A protein has these predicted regions:
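C-terminal alpha-helical interaction appendages
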Residues: 1-67
Length: 67
């Protein structure tokens, strides 16, 4: 991917925050559980690799692969 490290980290943080917000606001998970669910997932590990391109995907699409 032709994305700077700074842009990649920003996009990763944004999509992660949005996934957590969806889990808490729409699915009713407590914040701590939502954070744990996202950060401890295999998906989050893959999201941390810019080569996967997952940071370009929508939070809802990513969540569909989390559950």
């Amino acid at each position: 991917m032709n994305v700077s490290e700074k842009d990649f980290l920003y996009m990763k943080e944004q999509v992660t925050a949005k996934m957590i917000a969806i889990l808490t606001e729409e699915q009713g998970l407590p914040l701590e559980l939502a954070i744990d669910k996202v950060y401890s997932s295999e998906l989050f590990q893959k999201l941390g690799n810019a080569e996967t391109g997952l940071f370009f995907q929508s939070p809802r699409y990513l969540l569909s692969h989390l559950q």
